Regions:
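A conserved ligand/cofactor-binding region detector
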Residues: 2-826
Length: 826
């Protein structure tokens, strides 16, 4: 142990040295004196907790030094608000970023423990579900790595979204008990508590308004450390949990009415129990709105309090603070900040509004109008009456300004109003975000272009300078360095150094070696090892044995109709039919792998999961197929599972209907790991195509323009079915019970041949034909490996470091901590 003076306080303290012997002693110390466990009796999980505490000691100094540097240098801060942060396991990521992974591995070797087994004990934090949360997590990693003064805000969900189990082919939701593990990684902040209020009434007191709420709960803070790569900067992710306060009714309890004694407490604390409560009921919608306001109220109060501690005047808030809204869930932050500035700080309405418009920025993640969040005016008025007042005032201010310009007719004004008067009076949250933000960005070039010509076309006429693009990215530290150790060694060797982890553009040097037979062979071994790892997982967890020489065809993402997992199933069924018709043909064996969760209230998505499993049951047990097709559904998709699946992919499916996917980031992760894309011209597929070339990915289906033209002309899916016998047979088999003989009509609504909103029938033939081209390509081993290497070599643009640099330059106007402001390690 080394005695050292902490730069931010002047106190002497003992700082553990990052060597294996010291770490070993620290782990044992934590086990005995912090956890109170005899090392001879300790479980692998207890060893993990001790190791995490030892690692936290090493990281805590960076964390506190970073915070002090922000304060001492009066740095402008960005605060990132998101309902989701899909972090994945933190322990190994932190050790690699801190540069002490080898030392911890050696320490456990000295202890006679298998380090990999200990690491496997860590649960994925239940803080997110899909791409929205994973993007936020990648951004946190890049913010810390790039030394950006930043802080994330989210909710500490007690039960996550849910743990997915597959029972009789169907999704069953179970509580995700991730908080049952000890949380060595989080610092409780009992001094950071804020009151979050609901309901009541608003009193008009002359030129002021006073909100008198009827309900109040407390938000308590926990800080998760996010260490940057290189171990110099660490930023916080502040997570809020709901506490009801002193609501336990002792009188009821003493009378034996135990349920009544805790009813109010349980009701209030439900706010932070589950991510995305089922909103198919009135009570579910109310809980979800309360959850969103809970996040923004606690976060905005904290942001204002932090500013007032650092700066003498609240009026400089817009100069020192940027608040970013990740999708529409946190958009209530706009009226919440207005409420604080006007009601609590005494700032005039117009000045407060001008401050808000400089502070907020908003990322849009969807082009589907039905997915844009809206809330009933009556519900918002009942739960948040003061905020509804402010929203009305914002809307009136905006619409009056439009009318004053004089170039916009009444119909235009109606379309851009925050209040939708045509569907039962609803507050359009995306509209509020656009009006209250100084920048609105899409997340892929095609998405940003479509954003200003479709859902926000009217606003683009009013605020043409407000809209911009920041193409998403992913962190190579997790998606190569952690997920794919074999590829990491391969890149270190052939790029000549480890610098690609921070400068992903360095991957382009690999372009010089894509034709080298020895390099191709070496890459083939890396891919084979990854496939064997996944095959072992599938056999261990599901009892299904797969052929690792087969082409691994993978679609892993949230289950949704627009993502078109059903089209993938249609291809599988068609291939099944063709093999039975022509068993002597030299077929390319394929393993089709699915993973992803369906929202608990999403009937059709859950039906698609069941269809996949029913098709798998029939095909996997048909001996005539001879393992030429194997279909696998892996339950409970998570970041940790993705880290096993993605490196093993040969082909990845990005097959959403053109014009519906914002960017997608799984396509970037797959390409970074040497998988080839089967996709439509949608989202980031377009930009990946530009980078890797048409010979190194498979594009099929109609373009955005063709999709729109088909709709304008009156899309008739039955006409496609009538003229394509293969398609007709597939539709009939699925809808008439070939894969569900015990319930023949089970899937007669899945393909919806009379509606087919996502145009599966229109894209079917192109999809099938393109799949056979991929078969031919895969059989040419050298050509396939060359294409895979070209994909890796040209993914440098898709680093989340580049995305964050774009945000800092073009949207947040944030500068990183300099070496002088936060000195590196000696």
């Amino acid at each position: 142990m080394a005695k050292k003076k902490l730069p931010i306080s002047g106190y002497d303290y003992v700082m553990p040295k990052p060597d294996a012997e010291t770490i070993r002693k620290s782990i044992v110390y934590k086990l005995i004196f912090i956890l109170g466990v005899d090392p001879k009796e300790a479980t692998s999980h207890q060893w993990l907790n001790a190791a995490m505490l030892a690692a936290r000691d090493l990281i805590a100094e960076d964390f506190l030094k970073t915070r002090r540097a922000h304060i001492d240098n009066s740095k402008r801060m960005v605060y990132y608000l998101s309902m989701e942060f899909l972090l994945g396991r933190s322990f190994v990521n932190a050790l690699i970023n801190e540069g002490v992974y080898a030392e911890f591995e050696e320490a456990f070797k000295q202890l006679g423990k298998e380090f990999a087994d200990v690491c496997e004990q860590e649960e994925d934090p239940g803080l997110g579900n899909g791409g929205l949360g994973r993007l936020a997590a990648c951004f946190l990693d890049s913010l810390a790595t790039l030394r950006i003064p930043a802080m994330g805000y989210g909710i500490r969900y007690q039960y996550g979204m849910f743990k997915q189990e597959i029972v009789d082919g169907q999704q069953v939701e179970k509580p995700d008990l991730w908080l049952d593990q000890d949380l060595a990684w989080q610092f409780a902040r009992p001094n950071k508590q804020y009151s979050v209020r609901f309901g009541g009434q608003v009193l008009n007191l002359g030129d002021k308004k006073e909100w008198q709420p009827s309900e109040e709960i407390s938000a308590w803070a926990y800080d998760e450390i996010i260490p940057g790569y290189g171990g110099e900067c660490a930023n916080p992710l502040r997570l809020w949990t709901a506490h009801a306060g002193n609501l336990f009714d002792l009188a009821d309890f003493n009378r034996g009415d135990y349920a009544s004694a805790v009813r109010a407490q349980n009701s209030d604390e439900n706010i932070s129990r589950v991510l995305y409560p089922n909103d198919s009921t009135d009570s579910g919608r109310e809980l979800r709105l309360k959850q969103e306001y809970f996040l923004v109220s606690a976060s905005v109060q904290d942001i204002v309090a932090r500013h007032k501690c650092r700066f003498p005047s609240i009026r400089t808030l817009a100069d020192e603070v940027a608040i970013h809204l990740n999708d529409t869930h946190p958009v209530l932050a706009i009226p919440e900040l207005m409420r604080i500035l006007i009601d609590e700080e005494g700032i005039a309405w117009t000045e407060a509004w001008n401050m808000c418009c400089k502070i907020f920025s908003y990322t849009n993640h969807t082009l589907m109008s039905e997915a844009l969040e809206t809330w009933q005016v009556d519900l918002m008025g009942r739960l948040l009456p003061r905020h509804l007042d402010i929203i009305f005032e914002i809307n009136a201010y905006f619409l009056n300004a439009l009318r004053a310009i004089g170039n916009f007719d009444d119909d235009f004004v109606r379309r851009v109003s925050i209040i939708d008067e045509t569907h039962g009076r609803r507050v359009r949250m995306a509209w509020l975000a656009v009006i209250g933000s100084h920048k609105v960005n899409g997340v892929a070039k095609i998405h940003s272009d479509l954003m200003t010509t479709s859902i926000f076309a009217d606003f683009a006429k009013v605020f043409p300078e407000r809209f911009t693009n920041v193409t998403n990215g992913v962190t190579p530290r997790r998606w190569i360095n952690i997920a794919n150790p074999g590829l990491t060694k391969f890149l270190d060797k052939h790029l000549g150094d480890e610098d690609w982890r921070l400068h992903l553009d360095n991957l382009t040097k690999l372009n010089d070696k894509v034709d080298d037979a020895s390099v191709q062979a070496e890459f083939g071994e890396v891919k084979k090892a990854a496939k064997e790892r996944l095959a072992k997982y599938i056999e261990t967890e599901l009892g299904i044995k797969v052929n690792t020489d087969a082409l691994f065809d993978i679609q892993i993402k949230r289950i949704h109709e627009y993502k078109r997992q059903a089209l993938n199933v249609m291809h599988i069924v068609d291939r099944y039919n063709k093999i039975l018709e022509n068993p002597d043909f030299d077929w390319q064996p394929r393993v089709f792998i699915f993973a992803g969760k369906a929202a608990s209230a999403y009937y059709m998505a859950k039906k698609i999961i069941r269809l996949i499993n029913d098709v798998a049951k029939v095909i996997n047990n048909d001996t005539r197929i001879r393992d030429l097709i194997k279909v696998v559904y892996i339950p409970n998709y998570s970041v940790s599972l993705a880290q096993i699946i993605i490196p093993a992919a040969d082909l990845h499916e990005q097959i959403s209907l053109a014009g519906t996917e914002a960017p997608g980031t799984s396509n970037m992760k797959f390409a970074l790991n040497g998988a080839i894309c089967m996709g439509t011209l949608d989202g980031a597929n377009v930009e990946i195509l530009e980078k890797v070339g048409a010979d190194n990915c498979y594009i099929f289906g109609n373009t955005v323009e063709q999709v729109e033209e088909i709709r304008r002309n009156g899309y008739d899916p039955l006409s496609y079915i009538e003229r394509d016998s293969d398609l007709r047979r597939v539709v009939n088999q699925i809808s008439q019970g070939t894969f569900s003989p015990e319930e023949p009509n089970r899937y007669n609504d899945v393909l919806q041949p009379y509606g087919d909103f996502y145009q599966l029938m229109a894209d079917f033939r192109s999809y099938i034909d393109t799949q056979y081209k991929a078969d031919e390509h895969y059989r040419n081993v050298s050509a396939w490996r060359k294409s895979a290497l070209i994909n890796i070599a040209n993914m440098g643009f898709f680093s989340s470091d580049r995305s964050i640099a774009d945000y800092c330059r073009d949207i947040w106007y944030i500068k990183p901590l300099s070496e002088k402001e936060l000195p590196g390690r000696n």
